[in-house]
């Protein structure tokens, strides 16, 4: 019986010691694993953006919300999608995905440049409203060009002019 008690105490001390000595190292492992998962999500997002299916591209854009912060690669891919994707829903999703990063001046400048690329009334109106919400005065000249274009629908012109009024 004393041997069993001694073995139990040694076993308990072994587990307690192992737990005690492994704790600090475990935090570093978790941080490294979190970083790897983030990198994998970024790679998956970039890969999905190149797919033909609009559903895959929408899934890729939605993955950005799971990334802690966006790298230059991610924001560049989102701008490419916003400016060039044939599907309006994917472009709108890319615009929405960029909103959390508007504190970055590069993102704000990219959004202003994107105004000239848009032919969809939905994207045009959303960009104009975003510019007004951000108080991005640098966008006024691009918005005026859009409002004066013959290709811009009348209702869209009215909304863009309201956004310009907010900015001026």
Model regions and ranges:
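Eukaryotic acidic, Ser/Thr-rich intrinsically disordered low-complexity regions
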Residues: 148-168
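Alpha-solenoid repeat junctions
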Residues: 64-68, 98, 102, 131, ...
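Single-pass transmembrane signal-anchor helices and their membrane-water interface zones
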Residues: 1-27
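Immediate post-signal-peptide N-terminus of mature secreted/exported proteins
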Residues: 26-51, 57-65
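Conserved hydrophobic register position within alpha-solenoid helical repeats
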Residues: 59-63, 94, 126-127, 157-160
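Amphipathic alpha-helical scaffolding segments comprising HEAT/armadillo-like alpha-solenoid repeats
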Residues: 34-48, 69-82, 102-116, 136-148
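Short inter-helical turns and helix N-cap capping residues of alpha-solenoid HEAT/ARM repeat scaffolds
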Residues: 52-53, 85-87, 119-120, 149-153
């Amino acid at each position: 019986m004393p041997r069993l008690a001694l073995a139990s105490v040694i076993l308990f001390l072994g587990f307690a010691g192992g737990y005690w000595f492994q704790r600090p190292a475990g935090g570093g492992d978790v941080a490294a694993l979190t970083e790897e998962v983030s990198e994998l999500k970024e790679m998956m997002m970039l890969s999905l953006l190149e797919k033909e299916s609009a559903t895959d591209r929408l899934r890729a854009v939605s993955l950005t919300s799971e990334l802690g912060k966006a790298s230059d690669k991610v924001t560049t891919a989102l701008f490419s999608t916003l400016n060039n994707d044939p599907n309006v829903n994917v472009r709108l999703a890319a615009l929405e995905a960029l909103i959390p990063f508007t504190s970055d001046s590069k993102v704000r400048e990219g959004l202003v440049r994107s105004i000239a690329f848009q032919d969809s009334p939905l994207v045009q109106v959303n960009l104009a409203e975003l510019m007004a919400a951000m108080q991005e005065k640098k966008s006024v000249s691009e918005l005026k060009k859009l409002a004066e274009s013959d290709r811009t629908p009348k209702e869209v012109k009215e909304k863009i002019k309201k956004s310009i009024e907010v900015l001026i």
